Amino acid sequence: MRIGIFKHLKEMNNWRKTVYKKSPIEIVQALLAQGLTQSEIEANTGIKQPSISRILTGKNKDPRISTMVALEKLYLELATNSFSTSRLNKSKAK
C-alpha cells in the first residue's frame, strides 16, 4: 500500500503534488536529473539496473507496484530534502 511509506501528512501532501502525476519514465528521469546514476538508483531501491533502463527507454511502461513504490519513495526523499545525496548508498555504483 503506497500510503504505508508516509509517516507524516506533510509528506503525503508533497507526494500528491510531486509524484502522483508522474509516469515511471518521468520519475526515473527526475532521479537522473538529481545527479544519480542508474547504479545508484539500483543501490538505493533494490531495483536492478536493467529494469531501470527498460523503464527509462519505455520498454516497460507499466512496472510492478513494488518497483513504483521504491522509485517514488527515493524520489520523494530527494524532493523533500529529507535524504541528502551524500547519504545515498553508492556501494553498487560504478
Swiss-Prot record:
Keywords from the UniProt entry: DNA-binding, Transcription, Transcription regulation
Gene (name only): 2
DNA-binding region: 38-57
Gene Ontology terms, MF aspect: DNA binding
Residue ranges annotated for the HTH cro/C1-type domain, each copy included: 27-88
Pfam families noted in UniProt: HTH_3
The name this protein goes by in its record: Putative protein P2
Organism of provenance: Acyrthosiphon pisum secondary endosymbiont phage 1
